[in-house]
Amino acid sequence: MALFAVFQTTFFLTLLSLRTYQSEVLAERLPLTPVSLKVSTNSTRQSLHLQWTVHNLPYHQELKMVFQIQISRIETSNVIWVGNYSTTVKWNQVLHWSWESELPLECATHFVRIKSLVDDAKFPEPNFWSNWSSWEEVSVQDSTGQDILFVFPKDKLVEEGTNVTICYVSRNIQNNVSCYLEGKQIHGEQLDPHVTAFNLNSVPFIRNKGTNIYCEASQGNVSEGMKGIVLFVSKVLEEPKDFSCETEDFKTLHCTWDPGTDTALGWSKQPSQSYTLFESFSGEKKLCTHKNWCNWQITQDSQETYNFTLIAENYLRKRSVNILFNLTHRVYLMNPFSVNFENVNATNAIMTWKVHSIRNNFTYLCQIELHGEGKMMQYNVSIKVNGEYFLSELEPATEYMARVRCADASHFWKWSEWSGQNFTTLEAAPSEAPDVWRIVSLEPGNHTVTLFWKPLSKLHANGKILFYNVVVENLDKPSSSELHSIPAPANSTKLILDRCSYQICVIANNSVGASPASVIVISADPENKEVEEERIAGTEGGFSLSWKPQPGDVIGYVVDWCDHTQDVLGDFQWKNVGPNTTSTVISTDAFRPGVRYDFRIYGLSTKRIACLLEKKTGYSQELAPSDNPHVLVDTLTSHSFTLSWKDYSTESQPGFIQGYHVYLKSKARQCHPRFEKAVLSDGSECCKYKIDNPEEKALIVDNLKPESFYEFFITPFTSAGEGPSATFTKVTTPDEHSSMLIHILLPMVFCVLLIMVMCYLKSQWIKETCYPDIPDPYKSSILSLIKFKENPHLIIMNVSDCIPDAIEVVSKPEGTKIQFLGTRKSLTETELTKPNYLYLLPTEKNHSGPGPCICFENLTYNQAASDSGSCGHVPVSPKAPSMLGLMTSPENVLKALEKNYMNSLGEIPAGETSLNYVSQLASPMFGDKDSLPTNPVEAPHCSEYKMQMAVSLRLALPPPTENSSLSSITLLDPGEHYC
């Protein structure tokens, strides 16, 4: 015990000595100035790193000290930053501190110094600052190289929205340096003649591969060099959103979150942010490999409460979010499986499913959704392992989609995903009768009934309608009925019935059964045809119809309608109205503007006989007429004309035609009576006349001037406006006297045509009466007296070859001088004082002598020819023949003779009409044409016939030649005879 007391006394004495020493040290106020200050640089982070020590600290003592750091730039007097750094200092400890510079360290020289202050409660007051350490100079420019231009910082990484300072260093102060940010010039502040700094405030994110900044040095127009940097701007790291953890099997926690914007940059400057999951109760940490989810294994140590911290981190910042939860409250079940339907009929079904078991005695809350026919029904049920639910009140022949999902019934967290299946209920017999209506048209001796019915809705059809039964029963003969089966999907049929009353039933059938019958009665009496049609106006909402109630008992009304211009079978509709209703609105999307619709309103008696009550017609919206009438101009006179357009149909127009506008233009620009001035759409003026009666389709425009020019244009109009614009039709009134001339000339022309027709019909009689046919001499029987040699030649006889047996003086023309064509000789007056004859002479060289001669004379032809020497008897001396010149070529004469032999006189060719007088018969004499007998032998009997063809004596013909086959025609002396 005494030893312990001695030891205790010794300890306290030692402690007291130590406190006394400390007090002495403090009393001495030894200086604690920082020493051994060293400054290093980090160009990547653009930071200064300081390290120093503090001398004169007591051995194994710790003191709380404050260090004040001062940083200057370019020169020591330019202090840019002053700050304090507090820490606990140990004996012989090396202290560290870093400072990041906004200006790149390469752009300027920096100076650093430090002083200290003891801030420890163990030291008595007052405390005082130590002396400043000496300035420590930091310069990085010496290590940049020898280029003339530099831009700093290199590849700096900053966050979007921060402020950044860049600079350039130019070795040559004579250079002009321009800097650009993404092609746009920027302006900075000159720090010294070699350095200029640029402050970029709130830099934006442009691209993940960085923002381009470059500077160009030049002297005059000569570029000295270009340098640039890439400034990497990162998106701001966001705090994870919607951080949540849950389990589906109590073995694994599945944590998810929304990572927000990815902060990854190109060139591997910064990867995507990383996520770390830290659980504070267990102290475990896990680096997540996915950016939006992470799994955490649940241990079997019955831990139920978890406190998770999710840390997001990149090179620039960290973000974290925390959740605290109980494991049993975060159960997210797996999907149900094995969904099936049992005992499915037309209206009921049983749905079954299974769930994944996770714990014993676990209760599941399941939700069922049933979708069908546009409706959704929802049911909830609690189960242990297997689920089952009875679905009732279903529609027949309907496809349903049923699905189920489950959750923890004790601590609801969220529903599982859906699991579902489709099923279809069975068909049932149709539950409603078809809606039936009819159109009855009367024909001689029968009714034509067109039945229509609307297809049953899916709700009432209860399946696919296969056919319709139409039963027709004659009410006058109850035992007589007919059954017509109409296959679906037809919705109409046509029946031809006699003039009896009939009851018609329509029944719809599917694979299960038949619907109730829809009954309609066709009366033997015709419908009420005395109902007048009333015009109505529609609106955008449809047609509002009203009618007077039918006297007597009615079970309802039917309103049917159709397009006025189309086939009734293609657009026929009807609507049933209750017995106490006398108005309705017909509204449907099928109504179109400009289309006329006809409505008929029927009342249905208790016997289901329809009676027509009213007819109405109208447009849901009237439009202007779609076309103009084709106008004809009739009865055009000098003072008026009539316009008519009888063929214009008003029924097919897109509105009720209320009348017509007649526009008239004239050069006088004065409107006639009944017309008024109007201005057209093109600004031109004209006269306008309004016809208010749409059935009046003619107009007489009178009080016009003769020989005047007019233009007209007719257009119909409805309540919506006029018809389309068109060109004016031109018309000119005739002269005032032209009609009188027409009245005179037309009868004259008619008379002339009548005479010509009569003459044509009596042409044969006129010919026989006025100019009968002249007999053909070659067909005369006298020719049988003449004997021809083989191959005879037609010749003109010489004068000496024919001795006349009689002389007949035809005429004694006055003495004239005649130029004979063939010989170019003329006859004196003394030579022509006596009658002359023309002789036909033979021209054959082997002519043996005179032969028989036939002379024909016809004084009905050219008198001049007969006077100058026709076929006659002239007292001419045979010893003094006078040759008559050839009047035509021998070839033409021969052709003419041959023609006369073959044809009648009227068939002589046109080329031979130059012959004025040609004998039709020449004796076939043979001999030399040049040898004429001096003593002509008396010719045998010479038959006479009137010469039929005259030859023009005025034609100049060529002289005869030796090769001619015909002799010339000569003029004989008196006493000679010719044939």
Swiss-Prot record:
Q: Per the Swiss-Prot or TrEMBL record, what residue ranges does the short sequence motif Box 1 motif cover?
A: 770-778
Phosphoserine modification, residue list:
826, 889
For this protein, the record's InterPro entries field holds: FN3_dom, FN3_sf, Hematopoietin_rcpt_Gp130_CS, Ig-like_fold, LIF-R-like_Ig-like, LIFR_D2, Type1_Cytokine_Rcpt_Type2
Q: Which cysteines are joined by disulfide bonds?
A: 245-255
Q: What is its main location?
A: membrane
Provide the membrane-side ranges marked Cytoplasmic in the record.
762-979
Q: What induces it?
A: Activated by oncostatin-M. Up-regulated by IFNG/IFN-gamma. Up-regulated by bacterial lipopolysaccharides (LPS). Up-regulated by triacylated lipoprotein (Pam3Cys).
Tissue note: Expressed in keratinocytes (at protein level). Expressed at relatively high levels in all neural cells as well as fibroblast and epithelial cells.
Mind listing the UniProt keywords for this protein, alphabetically? Amyloidosis, Disease variant, Disulfide bond, Glycoprotein, Membrane, Phosphoprotein, Receptor, Repeat, Signal, Transmembrane, Transmembrane helix
A molecular function (GO) held by this record is: cytokine binding
Its record classes its membrane topology as:
Single-pass type I membrane protein
Q: Does the keyword Disulfide bond apply?
A: yes
One Gene Ontology cellular component = receptor complex
Q: Where is this motif: WSXWS motif?
A: 415-419
Relay the domain remarks. The WSXWS motif appears to be necessary for proper protein folding and thereby efficient intracellular transport and cell-surface receptor binding.
Biological role stated in the UniProt entry:
Associates with IL31RA to form the IL31 receptor. Binds IL31 to activate STAT3 and possibly STAT1 and STAT5. Capable of transducing OSM-specific signaling events.
Oligomeric state and interaction partners are given as: Heterodimer composed of OSMR and IL6ST (type II OSM receptor). Heterodimer with IL31RA to form the IL31 receptor.
Q: Spell out the family assignment given in the record's similarity comment.
A: Belongs to the type I cytokine receptor family. Type 2 subfamily.
What this protein is called in its record is Oncostatin-M-specific receptor subunit beta
Gene that this sequence comes from: OSMR
